[in-house]
């Protein structure tokens, strides 16, 4: 796939993240999986990091310096918006898990591209 396709996937995925984050807490099914909240954040943003890196024209350390702040700001925006949703709250720990996920995903793509 070319970077334009990944740009479309990235935007669609970001909309999906914001859509899920906008759901009131009582709308989520009660499952054991939701107790793994930080792991879910990490995986969610790991995918975001991969899509963000692949959506760029070139993959380089310079690209990484764009993707990482982008991922962090998107995580902060996501948490901020959650603070307005019934039964949801913002968490710095969630932002940290988001940033770790973006970093791992982006570094994975950078490492694979450099080989």
Features from the language model and the residues they span:
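Membrane-helix interface segments
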Residues: 2-8, 59-66, 88-92
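Terminal transmembrane helix and immediately flanking juxtamembrane interfaces
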Residues: 1-21, 93, 97-115
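Interfacial helix-loop-helix junctions of multi-pass membrane proteins
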Residues: 32-36, 77-99
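Small-polar-interrupted transmembrane alpha-helices in polytopic inner-membrane proteins
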Residues: 10-21, 66-83, 99
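Short helix-capping/hinge motifs at transmembrane helix termini and TM-loop junctions
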Residues: 23-24, 57, 86, 113
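Membrane interface segments of multi-pass transport proteins and intramembrane proteases
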Residues: 33-34, 60-61, 113
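Membrane-interfacial alpha-helical segments at the cytosolic side of multi-pass membrane proteins
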Residues: 44-58, 102-113
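"…centered on the first transmembrane helix and the immediately adjacent amphipathic helix/loop
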Residues: 1-54, 67
């Amino acid at each position: 796939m070319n970077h334009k396709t990944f740009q479309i996937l990235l935007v669609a995925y970001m909309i999906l993240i914001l859509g899920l984050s906008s759901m009131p807490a009582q709308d989520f099914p009660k499952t054991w999986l939701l107790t793994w909240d930080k792991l879910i954040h990490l995986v969610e943003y790991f995918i975001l990091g991969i899509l963000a890196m692949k959506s760029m024209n070139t993959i380089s350390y310079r690209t990484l310096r764009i993707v990482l702040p982008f991922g962090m700001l998107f995580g902060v925006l996501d948490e901020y918006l959650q603070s307005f949703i019934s039964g949801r709250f913002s968490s710095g720990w969630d932002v940290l898990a988001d940033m770790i996920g973006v970093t791992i995903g982006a570094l994975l793509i950078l490492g694979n591209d450099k080989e």
